[in-house]
Curated annotation (Swiss-Prot):
Keyword Magnesium on entry: yes
Name of the featured protein: Ribonuclease HI
Entry keywords, A to Z: Cytoplasm, Endonuclease, Hydrolase, Magnesium, Metal-binding, Nuclease
Subunit structure comment from the entry: Monomer.
Record note on cofactor: Binds 1 Mg(2+) ion per subunit. May bind a second metal ion at a regulatory site, or after substrate binding.
Cellular-component GO terms for this entry: cytoplasm
Length: 152
């Protein structure tokens, strides 16, 4: 597992909930790959999780990964909160169900395949990787908005 991949992720939503998009920039050596997607009715937090999940699903072998996100919800959720959620059968300490548990469970399943360091970066702060991921997420969101316009 000596492949090091750097991933930048972001999510975007028009309204919360509303049409949303996710984007990810994957970098390996001198190669980069941009990916994005959308959902017609979603939340910003679901798009943040989806960006990380879909980026990890692209990787075909075990890697050392650094994931950069401007979402404290994603970074804290996957590095700190998730362990208690699992212990509490996907409930928070107040016994309320964890929001987005379906996505958290899928993301957690991807973790065992890799060695991952999660890093938070300030959004919209001149970080080129974060800016690229944001543009991809916005592209996904705008695609969702256009589809909804076509449907009337």
């Amino acid at each position: 597992m000596d492949s090091k991949v750097v991933i930048y992720t972001d999510g975007a939503c028009a309204g919360n909930p509303g049409p949303g998009g996710w984007g990810a920039l994957l970098q390996f050596n001198d190669t980069s790959k941009e990916v994005f997607g959308y959902e017609l009715d979603t939340t910003n937090n679901r798009m943040e999780i989806t960006a990380a999940l879909e980026a990890l699903r692209i990787l075909k072998k075990s890697c050392n990964i650094e994931i950069y996100t401007d979402s404290k919800y994603l970074q804290q959720g996957i590095t700190a909160w998730i362990h208690n959620w699992i212990k509490n059968n996907w409930c928070k300490s107040n016994n309320e169900p964890v929001k987005n548990a379906d996505l958290w469970q899928k993301l957690y399943a991807e973790l065992s395949k890799h060695t991952i360091i999660w890093k938070w970066v300030k959004g919209h702060a001149n970080n080129s990787g974060n800016i690229a991921a944001d543009k991809l997420a916005v592209q996904g969101r705008e695609t969702a908005i256009e589809i909804l316009k076509c449907r009337g």
